[in-house]
Amino acid sequence: VRERGNDRRGATARTPLNRERVIRTAMAVADEKGAAALTMRAIAEPLGVEAMSLYHHVAGREEILDGMVDAVFGEIDLPPRDTDWKSAMRRRAFSARTVLRRHPWAIGLMDSRSQPGPATLRHHDALIGALRAAGFSVPMAAHAFSLIDSYLYGFVIQELSLPFSSSAQLEEVAGAILRDAPAGAYPHLTELATEHALKPGYDYADEFAFGLTLILDALHPDETAGPDRATPTPRPGRRSAGPGTGPAASSPQHHRAGRSAAG
């Protein structure tokens, strides 16, 4: 691997370049500048190498994106096995929200990859397994998985898009809107702002827990719970569950793969 410049010292002592460093550096670039800024040159620059050096460790940009998505899933806490299913789903959802806020580019990529890595598959399998062990049938587990993640992704997208990130900023933004609005034109919006959003202690992040609780309370296992529910047993004449089953079967990624196979 050729290092940039001729005046670097201690080159022999620097950390060797490998696939993990390439992936982590790409994530750092995306965290700062967004996924659109991810060129091989942009990734190579902070590593102090030429862009062509990256190809010794990754096949190209697509493999880097695959690795980034897998690393994100690897940062999310798996549903714990020593608690009830609602607590497990809640803990996993809060962990996922924290991780996705840390990597704002991730949501747009997470369901777009056709070659999921081991952390992604392990995450999905653990989530489905927790629901199955609690007594959710395969279809109901798929519905629950899809519903929870649709809410999770949507909330994070909205949260990251807000024009404020603190109470002071919210007061400034809302105050300007109310001042510029014609008197009495928007009574309900004014009421919500003055009687709720601008009250001391208000935090938009609290809305996440409220909505998640509503979703979890609306979901119910539809089969008998038990530890053996998490491990499917192949039936005679049928293939065991595998790719194409569970929540992933409802994702855009799955449908694109199915169309490709059919064509």
Protein language model features and the residues they cover:
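Helix-turn-helix
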Residues: 21, 25, 29-63, 67
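Hydrophobic alpha-helical bundle segments that form small-molecule/ligand-binding pockets
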Residues: 123-147, 151, 155-178, 196, ...
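N-terminal intrinsically disordered/low-complexity leader segments
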Residues: 1-17, 187-196, 227-239, 243, ...
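Short, basic, alpha-helical segments at the C-terminal edge of helix-turn-helix-like DNA-binding modules
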Residues: 69-75
